[in-house]
């Protein structure tokens, strides 16, 4: 296992951490290193870039949704055959679940994993003041191991030298390089953040250009040197090897549905599920021998016209759920199962039609934040009076004129609310779950799939 890992932390959002992280990954890979990516927090989109540039599946590490031991194990497992791990932070270094603690922050992740930190500082229109910013971050949480700085948005090499001299004199840590303002290399954004790489097609030229830019102005070998960290010890592994498959769960996965945590898949496999992917966008049906169905989040609204035209696919999904497949649909998957998606131009696209009501897109954020979740009575995922953690992030609202059964009670910063839709074997809602927050959910789902499979066989 590699003992080199580095947290890329920003003084705030928009530094920009993601562009720099991708550039560092590309430059390290070009230098011959095997790079493993991680993303602090629940975001699905940035890891798609990490995965594309490193050619290794990037992992989310979230210290609010997951127990600290699980965070450490995820890092240790994924880093086993890597030369260096790059962990992209979220928001500002100390920003997390609430403003009064470090819970869920990049800083907390750095402490949990005992990882050195490279601080990215926006140095536009300042020189010595940059040192004051860095010193403030050092003193705010002295136990955080900030080992170096990257100066971002510098105006020239001369400007960089001023910033570097001030920081190194006052803060006693190296400034390992800089990036100039370069709008041409800014990754485009959209209502859910960065466009998933799966939609952008061929990204190799972009990665190469960004990697070369980082190589030209950042000391990559110094970065590698600073990444040396203590080995993470795992005493009682949570993740186990996949067991012999007992049920088959179909997973909708393409450009419209691609928001999944890799650990969710691994926990399902460890519990006896074989996962079979299909693409609704490409006209692929739910596999006939599937015993369960998982439709994750994504951008169905961006592909609403194409999805609306996939009549056979919609019939296939509807028939699979109606015949009893235990189904979980999260956010985009939930939207897909409604009567229709109404886009911001008031065009309505017909969807599967199993959930009575429509989803209406809007320009303003409808919901954002972590959720503590309990299931409503009859929710098979929550058998045994369990709780789970997840998050919401969407620009749409669900409207229905019919009575229906919510799937969950969720608790966020604004209090409790009922959320989602439940009907027998169908559980759907805006909430994205990390199964690592409650592995019992996985056991419940697989057991429900086994029971449904037996019931169908007995009926033959």
Swiss-Prot record:
Pathway assigned in UniProt: Cofactor biosynthesis; adenosylcobalamin biosynthesis; cob(II)yrinate a,c-diamide from sirohydrochlorin (anaerobic route): step 10/10
Enzyme class: ligase
Domain GATase cobBQ-type: 248-440
NCBIfam families: cobB, PRK01077.1
Role according to the record: Catalyzes the ATP-dependent amidation of the two carboxylate groups at positions a and c of cobyrinate, using either L-glutamine or ammonia as the nitrogen source.
UniProt domain comment: Comprises of two domains. The C-terminal domain contains the binding site for glutamine and catalyzes the hydrolysis of this substrate to glutamate and ammonia. The N-terminal domain is anticipated to bind ATP and cobyrinate and catalyzes the ultimate synthesis of the diamide product. The ammonia produced via the glutaminase domain is probably translocated to the adjacent domain via a molecular tunnel, where it reacts with an activated intermediate.
Name of this chain's protein: Cobyrinate a,c-diamide synthase
Organism: Priestia megaterium
């Amino acid at each position: 296992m590699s003992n080199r890992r580095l947290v890329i932390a920003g003084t705030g959002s928009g530094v920009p951490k993601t562009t720099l992280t991708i550039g560092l990954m590309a430059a390290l890979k070009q230098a011959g290193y095997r790079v493993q990516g991680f993303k602090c927090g629940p975001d699905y989109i940035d890891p798609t870039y990490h995965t594309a540039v490193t050619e290794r599946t990037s992992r989310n590490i979230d210290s609010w949704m997951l127990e600290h031991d699980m965070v450490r194990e995820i890092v240790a497992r994924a880093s086993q055959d890597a030369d260096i791990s790059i962990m992209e932070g979220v928001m500002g270094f100390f920003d997390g679940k609430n403003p009064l603690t470090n819970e869920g922050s990049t800083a907390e992740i750095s402490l949990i994993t005992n990882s050195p930190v490279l601080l990215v500082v926006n140095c536009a229109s300042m020189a010595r003041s940059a040192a004051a910013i860095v010193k403030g971050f050092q003193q705010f949480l002295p136990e955080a191991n900030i080992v170096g700085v990257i100066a971002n948005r510098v105006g020239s090499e001369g400007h960089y030298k001023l910033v570097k001299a001030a920081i190194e004199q006052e803060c006693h840590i190296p400034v390992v390089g800089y990036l100039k303002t370069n709008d041409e290399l800014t990754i485009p954004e959209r209502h859910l953040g960065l466009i998933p790489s799966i939609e952008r097609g061929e990204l190799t030229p972009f990665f190469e250009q960004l990697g070369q830019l980082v190589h030209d102005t950042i000391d990559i070998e110094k970065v590698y040197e600073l990444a040396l960290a203590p080995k993470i010890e795992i005493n009682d592994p949570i993740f186990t090897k996949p067991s012999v498959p007992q049920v088959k769960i179909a997973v909708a996965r393409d450009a419209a549905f691609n928001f999944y945590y890799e650990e969710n898949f691994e926990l399902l496999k460890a519990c006896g599920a074989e996962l079979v992917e299909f693409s609704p966008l490409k006209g692929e049906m739910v596999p006939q021998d599937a015993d369960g169905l998982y439709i994750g989040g994504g951008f169905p609204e961006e592909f609403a016209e194409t999805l609306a035209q996939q009549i056979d696919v919609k019939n296939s999904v509807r028939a699979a759920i109606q015949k009893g497949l235990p189904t979980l649909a999260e956010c985009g998957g939930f939207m897909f199962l409604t009567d229709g998606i109404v886009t911001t131009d008031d065009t309505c696209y017909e969807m599967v039609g199993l959930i009575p009501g429509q989803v209406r897109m809007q320009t303003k954020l409808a919901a954002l934040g972590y959720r503590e979740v309990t299931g409503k009575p009859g929710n098979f995922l929550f058998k045994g009076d369990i709780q789970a953690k997840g998050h919401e992030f969407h620009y749409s609202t669900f409207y229905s004129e019919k009575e229906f059964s919510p799937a969950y009670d969720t608790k966020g910063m604004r209090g409790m609310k009922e959320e989602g839709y439940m009907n027998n074997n169908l559980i759907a809602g805006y909430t994205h779950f990390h199964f690592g927050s409650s592995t019992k959910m996985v056991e419940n789902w697989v057991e429900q799939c086994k029971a449904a499979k037996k019931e169908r066989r007995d009926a033959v």
